[in-house]
Amino acid sequence: MKFAVIVFPGSNCDRDMYHAVKEVAGAEAELVWYTETDKLEGVDGILLPGGFSYGDYLRSGSMASTSDVMHKIREHAAKGKPVLGVCNGFQILTESGLLPGALMRNKHLSFMCHQEELVVEDNQTFFTSLYEKKEVVRFPIAHGEGSYFCDEATLKELQANNQIVFTYKNNPNGSIENIAGIRNKQGNVLGMMPHPERAVEELLGSDDGLKLFKSMIANWRDSYAINA
Amino acid sequence: MKKVTVYITLKPGVLDPQGKAIQESLQSLGYQEVEDARVGKFIELQVEEGPNIEERITEMCDRLLANPVIENYQFDLEGVK
């Protein structure tokens, strides 16, 4: 499986993401500068890393969502290929309309940077199949605008379609229904505020994130084997 | 040229932690009468006059300036000499 890690001006978790999938999970990966849209041909999975794309001007992720590379990523997602957005990547996915809702200022306004316990609400997804259902994992969070919000109708739809993939045990930012990560209806786009790529080795304080990348690689291999 | 003033506000019911912090700070300065504060954005554009100007500004608001999931907007148009 070949991943592209998209690098925007202001991305700062791109190398962590690259390290996690390539050096630790053992997949092919390439850092792709946001103007190099032709490099996405032949890529299997797209990874949108954390950081502050375009300095988070106007709203987090809003400027990046209008870039040419996002049009390519929309096409990629429409074909059912996997897209993972973490932190600023999640903000870009909601701003692009690839995922519903919005990410707002944390309830207590402060930027938070520490480990949080999450619950894997759904392990029947492309991204979480190696976890147990309701497994508690520890991932770092590092955000100032990570409070997930959506209207009542959208929330009901998320619940009805099992689109809530991760929740916080101790909701640190005021997210609706403790939501930490959601997927799209089709199941090939996942957005989450916590950082699985910073939890792939015990040295980092947790290696709970590794199973997320390994799930993606294993599920890709399975679907490829079926198609081949 | 037209001057466009766009006002963006959080939808009613959407938690506004920045507004809350401002309200609490005002109260701590002794302004107990402040019952609520909401923070919005104010954007000024200079736009060449042309057909469908209002429609085009509405489109700009929907596509970029405001996030319709959480924000409402309104705008004023005025001529610039």
Swiss-Prot record, chain A:
Q: Residue ranges of the Glutamine amidotransferase type-1 domain?
A: 3-226
The keyword rRNA-binding is annotated on this UniProt entry: no
Q: Which reaction does it catalyse?
A: N(2)-formyl-N(1)-(5-phospho-beta-D-ribosyl)glycinamide + L-glutamine + ATP + H2O = 2-formamido-N(1)-(5-O-phospho-beta-D-ribosyl)acetamidine + L-glutamate + ADP + phosphate + H(+); L-glutamine + H2O = L-glutamate + NH4(+)
In short, the EC number is 6.3.5.3, 3.5.1.2
Pathway field: Purine metabolism; IMP biosynthesis via de novo pathway; 5-amino-1-(5-phospho-D-ribosyl)imidazole from N(2)-formyl-N(1)-(5-phospho-D-ribosyl)glycinamide: step 1/2
Under the subunit heading, UniProt states: Part of the FGAM synthase complex composed of 1 PurL, 1 PurQ and 2 PurS subunits.
- Name of the molecule in the record: Phosphoribosylformylglycinamidine synthase subunit PurQ
State the organism named in the record: Oceanobacillus iheyensis (strain DSM 14371 / CIP 107618 / JCM 11309 / KCTC 3954 / HTE831)
Identify the gene encoding this protein: purQ
